[in-house]
């Protein structure tokens, strides 16, 4: 602390002994030791306080750095969330538009077909299967419909019969009619 070597301390002791004398010298050394101890304690307290302040300042800097990083990430997340919401709204709008168009087309087909010709709208076939042209007529090769309600000749194409069998098996229905 004071950077005093052995020789410096010895010279100070000799001068103190000459000035104070041997009786007062012991008391002066004791008091000097007490003051030196108090000075060291005060110095160490100040040193530790400065170190704590530096640590607090470092923590503040680290906290501020983390806060900036968190703010940056939060802004990125909010930006991506807004973009995602915009895309989701666009997809939802597209699906709503397609649904409206399908509803309009179904209403248009129902009103265009009239109430008497329900079979042309697909209502006559209980299976819901119709030809692509919109009629209940069997395919050009002859054979039965998927429900098998017409009773046409059994000389249907083998592929048609296997399809009928597969459909009946999936529907959980009864046994297939054989003619």
UniProtKB/Swiss-Prot annotation:
Q: Where is the composition biased (Basic and acidic residues)?
A: 75-86, 94-106
List where in the cell it is found: Cell inner membrane
Gene Ontology BP term (one): protein transport by the Tat complex
Residue segments, region Disordered: 75-179
Q: Which keywords does UniProt give here?
A: Cell inner membrane, Cell membrane, Membrane, Protein transport, Translocation, Transmembrane, Transmembrane helix, Transport
The source's superkingdom equals: Bacteria
Name a GO molecular-function annotation.
Answer: protein transmembrane transporter activity
Task: Provide the transmembrane region boundaries.
Answer: 1-21
What does UniProt give as the signal peptide span? none
Q: How does it sit in the membrane?
A: Single-pass membrane protein
Tell me any Pfam family this protein matches: TatA_B_E
Give the record's GO CC terms. Answer: TAT protein transport complex
Q: Which HAMAP family match?
A: TatB
Under the subunit heading, UniProt states: The Tat system comprises two distinct complexes: a TatABC complex, containing multiple copies of TatA, TatB and TatC subunits, and a separate TatA complex, containing only TatA subunits. Substrates initially bind to the TatABC complex, which probably triggers association of the separate TatA complex to form the active translocon.
Protein family per UniProt:
Belongs to the TatB family.
Q: What does this protein do?
A: Part of the twin-arginine translocation (Tat) system that transports large folded proteins containing a characteristic twin-arginine motif in their signal peptide across membranes. Together with TatC, TatB is part of a receptor directly interacting with Tat signal peptides. TatB may form an oligomeric binding site that transiently accommodates folded Tat precursor proteins before their translocation.
Give the protein's recorded name: Sec-independent protein translocase protein TatB
Q: Which organism is it from?
A: Alkalilimnicola ehrlichii (strain ATCC BAA-1101 / DSM 17681 / MLHE-1)
Report the gene name: tatB
């Amino acid at each position: 602390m004071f950077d005093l070597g052995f020789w410096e301390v010895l010279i100070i002791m000799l001068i103190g002994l000459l000035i104070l004398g041997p009786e007062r010298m012991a008391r002066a050394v004791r008091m000097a030791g007490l003051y030196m101890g108090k000075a060291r304690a005060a110095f160490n307290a100040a040193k530790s306080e400065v170190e704590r302040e530096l640590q607090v300042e470092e923590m503040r800097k680290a906290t501020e750095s983390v806060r900036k990083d968190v703010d940056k990430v939060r802004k990125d997340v909010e930006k991506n969330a807004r973009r995602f919401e915009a895309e989701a709204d666009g997809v939802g709008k597209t699906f709503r538009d397609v649904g409206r168009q399908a509803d309009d087309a179904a209403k248009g087909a129902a009103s265009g077909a009239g109430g008497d010709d329900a079979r042309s709208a697909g209502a006559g076939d209980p299976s819901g299967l119709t030809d692509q042209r919109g009629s209940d007529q069997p395919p050009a090769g002859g054979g039965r419909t998927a429900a098998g309600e017409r009773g046409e000749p059994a000389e249907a194409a083998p592929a048609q019969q296997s399809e009928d069998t597969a459909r009946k098996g999936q529907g959980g229905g009864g046994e297939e009619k054989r003619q």
